[in-house]
Amino acid sequence: MEIVAENRKARFDYFVLQEYDAGMVLVGSEVKSLRQRKVNMGDAYVLEKDMELWIHNLHISEYNRSDRKNHKPLRVRKLLLRKREIHKIAGNIKVSGLAVVPLMIFFNNKGIAKIKIAIVKGKKLYDKREAIKTRDWQREKSRISRREV
């Protein structure tokens, strides 16, 4: 598995409730751009329309060696999942306070581009502060243990 991009901010801003791996409908120049790791998914989110999932604001840069038939960087892309997974995710989108965001884009062992999406719930400010304190304490603990050895 070759990781192309990771949305680390999503793990900080949200509680991850459930994760899914999905395929994406892409054109050739988008795949080539993904191989060059020219993707930004900081503002990306998933919406449901007609029992299909669509990812919005996923910026895949134009492939620089492509001709004039290049793709649009911010076009809406369809996600490919099983029907029961789509029903489950669509039901969670309608629940107040829950959202679906991308966590990671990767190429699987067969070389197919996949995206890991998650059903998330937003963190409050005090939850974010608690996460920072925990992370700092773990870092300090590892420094202390290295000094003692």
Curated annotation (Swiss-Prot):
GO terms for biological process: trans-translation. One of its GO terms (molecular function) is RNA binding. Keywords: Cytoplasm, RNA-binding. GO terms for cellular component: cytosol. Its main location: cytoplasm. Transmembrane segments: none annotated. It holds the Pfam family SmpB. It is found in: Cytoplasm. PROSITE patterns: SSRP. Required for rescue of stalled ribosomes mediated by trans-translation. Binds to transfer-messenger RNA (tmRNA), required for stable association of tmRNA with ribosomes. tmRNA and SmpB together mimic tRNA shape, replacing the anticodon stem-loop with SmpB. tmRNA is encoded by the ssrA gene; the 2 termini fold to resemble tRNA(Ala) and it encodes a 'tag peptide', a short internal open reading frame. During trans-translation Ala-aminoacylated tmRNA acts like a tRNA, entering the A-site of stalled ribosomes, displacing the stalled mRNA. Belongs to the SmpB family. This is SsrA-binding protein.
